[in-house]
């Protein structure tokens, strides 16, 4: 949380100077602060559904910020690609959460970890959680959205997209090792 907060502060200060000549700054800063709130929420929650909500907040705000310069058609295309992939990933994450809550009637990561039985549905939920989060953090081979998004977004947005990607990586590791740690250690 401290690293994300300090990064957010630095990027916001940088964006004050970098974006000062642009129009529509109210929308830019509203989306930037939504992105910051989404990232801070993702790293601080211990609940799968709240993690999903914060992931979606950061995804939608990130897509809007990538397409912020609407006069650049490539930026709009990159923002649309980012939004489409984030939406497909969100559908998979929501399906995984539905599978887990349907089996165990719990959303808290610690409670789920104590109840997990590593059934076939649990393994399916693992895949449905891991793949979208790996895509969101830009892991190979699901990193195809990053070149367009990083090159067309304003530099302050690109910096914060990297922070957002690292928050998704943290969420991926937290879910993998908290929920599926015993299953992953058994496989080795």
Residues covered by each model-derived region:
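C-terminal ends of transmembrane helices
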Residues: 9-21, 64-78, 136-151
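Alpha-helical transmembrane segments of multi-pass inner-membrane proteins
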Residues: 3, 81-86, 127, 161
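Alpha-helical transmembrane segments of multipass membrane proteins
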Residues: 13, 37-41, 64-65, 98-99, ...
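Hydrophobic cores of alpha-helical transmembrane segments in multi-pass inner/ER membrane proteins
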Residues: 2-9, 97, 126-133
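Short helix-boundary/re-entrant hairpin motifs in multi-pass inner-membrane proteins
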Residues: 78, 124-187
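Alpha-helical multi-pass transmembrane bundles of energy-transducing inner-membrane proteins
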Residues: 27-124, 135
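Hydrophobic alpha-helical transmembrane segments in multi-pass integral membrane proteins
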Residues: 1-40, 171
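Transmembrane helix-loop junctions and nearby membrane-interface residues
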Residues: 9-12, 16-19, 44-47, 97-104, ...
